[in-house]
Structures are given as structure tokens and as C-alpha cells.
Amino acid sequence: MDPNTVSSFQVDCFLWHVRKRVADQELGDAPFLDRLRRDQKSLRGRGSTLGLDIKTATRAGKQIVERILKEESDEALKMTMASVPASRYLTDMTLEELSRDWSMLIPKQKVAGPLCIRMDQAIMDKNIILKANFSVIFDRLETLILLRAFTEEGAIVGEISPLPSLPGHTAEDVKNAVGVLIGGLEWNDNTVRVSETLQRFAWRSSNENGRPPLTPKQKREMAGTIRSEV
């Protein structure tokens, strides 16, 4: 196993532990708590994939961070922070919409690279909007936290989420997954539109319905999604 993969996991575990302590002291806002929950799932998936114990990794990560901090001068730390571009966290969904449990009458699921697409194929003839919580950097989507499809009545009928075992995805991965989700929902004569925030940062071009036109590849994936069982 690559030692850098192990040390990266160890440091991520320790930093999550620090953030959890911050949350326990009620010092974190909604986006902070949102990322904390999502990262916990990601770490569990990575730990299972790597065969590493999270508690042991956390202790090792603490030693790595402490060693670095001892070697780091205050001036060097300031320069490093100043040179790192800041990302922004954008929220279409409320905390309740983000954390709400939902179920499907006719569940369909597809894994597209590092993303999991889920939708309820029982939904027909509905007006649906896609909302997402994500971070952006340089005016481009950086990390998708969660995307969900809502009916006008507020019911959740679809979702795109990162796979905990495959961390890391690109804006293009998200764009392709959105195309597959839209295609699957439109198959049953639903009308789908995308939130303005997601439309602005997830892609640059869209049609008059507020969503990107499907590529031939996305249409093929859409057809495969309709036929695939969970």
C-alpha cells in the first residue's frame, strides 16, 4: 500500500476528530456540520477499503500534525494560508432537506464513476427541481456534498451523492450524473429544471428549460439506468 495513501487517511481522520470537537462545543454552523456528517461516511468507506482502523489512524494522524506544527513558523503559516485559494460553500437545500430520509416505490440506482445516482421510477407527470449543496472555487464546482430532486410538493424523488469508498470527483463527473438523473426522470414524462445556483456553477451552457442538453453518451447511460435494478 502506498505510504502516502495511509498518511493522508491518518491526517484526515485526526482533522475530522478536531472538527467533531468543535461541533461538540456548538461552534460549527450548518455547512460545517453538513460537511462533518458527509466526511464521516467518507472516512468509514476509506477505512474499510484500506483495511485501517479509524481510531488507530486518528492517533497516528495527530502525531503527523503535531510534528508539522512544531516545524512550522508563524510567518510561514501566514504565507501558506494567504496563497491557498478560498472555496465557498453554497446551499440550495435547508438542513432539513439535506438530512431527511426518503424512500422509493420503484427504486433505481446507477454508479457513475465516483458518484451514486438514485431515483424513484414510480414518479410520473411531476414538476421537479434539482437542488444541491456544494463548494465552489474559481467560480467552478469543487465538491458536491449532495444533490436531490424535489417535486413541487417537497417530496424527494432522486439523489446524487459521492461514493464514500471513491473520494474525489470533478465538475464534469457531476454534470454527467445530472444528465443521467434528468434523463431518468424525464423518461416518465416529468418536467425537470435545475436550481439557478447549480446551473451557474455546475456547467456553463444550458437550454431554455434551465438544464444542459443531454449528450449522446448521457442518453445511452439514461437508457441503461432505466433498465437497471438496484
UniProtKB/Swiss-Prot annotation:
Record's compositionally biased regions (Basic and acidic residues): 218-230
Sequence motif: Nuclear localization signal, positions: 34-38
Gene3D superfamilies attached to this UniProt entry: Influenza virus non-structural protein, effector domain, S15/NS1, RNA-binding
Record-linked InterPro entries: NS1, NS1A, NS1A_effect_dom-like_sf, uS15_NS1_RNA-bd_sf
Manganese in keyword set: no
GO biological process: symbiont-mediated suppression of host cytoplasmic pattern recognition receptor signaling pathway via inhibition of RIG-I activity; symbiont-mediated suppression of host gene expression; symbiont-mediated suppression of host mRNA processing; symbiont-mediated suppression of host PKR/eIFalpha signaling; symbiont-mediated suppression of host type I interferon-mediated signaling pathway
Source organism, top-level taxon: Viruses
Cellular compartment(s): Host nucleus; Host cytoplasm
Chain positions covered by the region annotation Disordered: 205-230
Principal place of residence: host cell
Start and end residues of each stretch annotated as CPSF4-binding: 180-215
Motif (Nuclear export signal): 137-146
Parts forming coiled coils: none
GO cellular component terms listed in the entry, alphabetical order: host cell cytoplasm; host cell nucleus
Region (PABPN1-binding): 223-230
Region listing for RNA-binding and homodimerization, in residue ranges: 1-73
UniProt GO MF annotations: protein serine/threonine kinase inhibitor activity; RNA binding
Quaternary structure note: Homodimer. Interacts with host TRIM25 (via coiled coil); this interaction specifically inhibits TRIM25 multimerization and TRIM25-mediated RIGI CARD ubiquitination. Interacts with human EIF2AK2/PKR, CPSF4, IVNS1ABP and PABPN1.
Purpose: Inhibits post-transcriptional processing of cellular pre-mRNA, by binding and inhibiting two cellular proteins that are required for the 3'-end processing of cellular pre-mRNAs: the 30 kDa cleavage and polyadenylation specificity factor/CPSF4 and the poly(A)-binding protein 2/PABPN1. In turn, unprocessed 3' end pre-mRNAs accumulate in the host nucleus and are no longer exported to the cytoplasm. Cellular protein synthesis is thereby shut off very early after virus infection.
Entry's free-text remark on domains: The dsRNA-binding region is required for suppression of RNA silencing.
Protein name, entry field: Non-structural protein 1
Naturally occurring in which organism (per UniProt): Influenza A virus (strain A/X-31 H3N2)
Taxonomic lineage: Viruses, Riboviria, Orthornavirae, Negarnaviricota, Polyploviricotina
Name of the gene encoding the protein in the UniProt record: NS
